[in-house]
A protein has these predicted regions:
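A short, N-terminal "cap"/entry segment at the start of jelly-roll beta-barrel domains
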Residues: 2-83, 157-170
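Short solvent-exposed loop/turn micro-motifs enriched in small/polar/acidic residues
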Residues: 57, 93-94, 120, 130
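A short beta-loop-beta micro-motif enriched in histidine and acidic residues
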Residues: 67-74, 84-100, 114-116, 142
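Short, conserved beta-strand element in jelly-roll/cupin
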Residues: 78-81, 93-112, 149-152
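Short acidic-glycine-tyrosine-enriched beta hairpin
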Residues: 114-132
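Short, glycine/charged-enriched secondary-structure capping and boundary segments
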Residues: 116-118, 142-144, 161-164
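Ligand-binding loop in jelly-roll beta-barrel domains
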Residues: 122, 131-156
Length: 170
């Protein structure tokens, strides 16, 4: 941490970031300072209806508004089951830098390439899935509800062969 002007105290110069970056090495990432009225974005969308326009027919999706609020940097969806689970997703991976889920209700089961055991994420638990990791959703409860957060909001999904389950990458 850079020394403060008075090294005998814990004072931080007004121009310095409290974590030690004086702002001289890196330009700020955002235009600021701003008034709250210029920057506040309402991301809660309780009135937003669920839609059945996602990749799976057995769940419905509700956009939480994060993509619009973050210029596409982050996407968030409320996802819930509407029919019994009828088929695994098949092995695939997503082109994203962050993929997080938080299960509100029920449970979800994954298989991961190179991992022998099924990974279960139950209500009150979360999962951070590293970028590019091949996986297969192999089960879920009929009452599943979760929040999914992705970075970026828009991303590609690629199917991969069964050989991935054995750790063979093409």
């Amino acid at each position: 941490m850079p020394e403060s002007p008075d090294s005998s105290s814990n004072a931080v110069p007004a121009s310095a970031h409290r974590h030690g970056d004086t702002g001289t090495r890196f330009p700020p990432r955002y235009d600021g300072p701003k008034l709250l009225s210029e920057a506040l974005t309402q991301m809660t969308r309780g009135e937003e209806a669920f839609a059945r326009d996602g990749p799976r027919a057995d769940v419905e999706y509700r956009d939480l508004g994060w993509a619009a609020a973050s210029s596409g940097a982050i996407g968030a969806k409320h996802i819930r089951a509407i029919r019994p689970f009828d088929a695994e997703t098949g092995w695939h991976w997503h082109d994203m830098s962050g993929h997080f889920i938080y299960v509100l209700k029920g449970w979800l089961k994954f298989r991961y390439a190179g991992v022998a055991d099924v990974v279960t994420v139950a209500a009150g638990s979360s999962l951070s899935q590293p970028a590019g990791v091949a996986h297969n959703v192999v089960g879920r409860s009929d009452d599943l509800e979760l929040i999914e957060i992705n970075m970026p909001a828009g991303y590609g999904t690629w199917e991969v062969g069964e050989g991935v389950a054995a750790g063979v990458h093409k």
